[in-house]
Amino acid sequence: MACYDDFAWFYNRYWSEEFHSAAFPILERIWLDRLPPKARILDVCCGTGYLAALLAARGFRVTGLDVSREMLAYARANAPAAEFTLADAASFHLPGACDAAVSTFDSLNHLLEPAALEAAFRNIAAALRPGGLLAFDMLLDEAYQTRWGESFALVRDDHLLTITGAAFDSHSRIARITVTMFRLLEGAWQRSDVTIEERCYSPDEISQALAAAGFGELLCYDAGDLGMAGQLGEGRTFFVASKLE
């Protein structure tokens, strides 16, 4: 999708490493320690591949998928030991050969309709062996109510980014931000403007979608309680669900 393509350079440079450096110890504690050595892992909405690189370095066999070509271009450079494919979480199809799956950095909040979230869970379940473990994080109501409206600016000599117009509609449950980006390329400034949207799902909606998709046991963990400090952890919950045998 174009909005994620335009955002990929900034995401790769400023956000992916920061988030996944904080998230990886949590994933080790609640999910990775339960997997067999050399497990095959599906990384859904893999972004620029920072998590895939960490997993591959631990000996896991990783397949990443993302809807953005530009994100995947960075992912292939960042994690050459992993495999990547262009696909939408709500419509991909892979054979059930994975031992585990993961989706991080509130990626599943970007699915704006409950039917799309359930479809993503169904697709993930179809890609997992019986008993396979899915780990993911999502932002819940606290995150959108308390910090979503904050503006942000990042200014460097050859690039800048602003986040403005942040809004959360408590009726539709849709949150939006406007991202304006400039990069100095070959002596000329290039501008991109994108709108990024997320949906705030309730814990009940998430658990119901998982159950409908064929997942059983569900464990929930507050990110702050697991050591994810500051805004990264605020209003964020990690989930681990197992596919029914």
Q: Model-predicted segments: where are they?
A:
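C-terminal lobe and adjacent flexible extensions of AdoMet/dcAdoMet transferase-like proteins
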Residues: 197-245
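A short His-aromatic
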Residues: 109-111
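SAM-dependent methyltransferase
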Residues: 135-208
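Residues lining the SAM
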Residues: 104-106
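A short glycine-rich, Lys/Arg-flanked "PGG" loop and its adjoining helix->strand segment in the class I
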Residues: 118-130
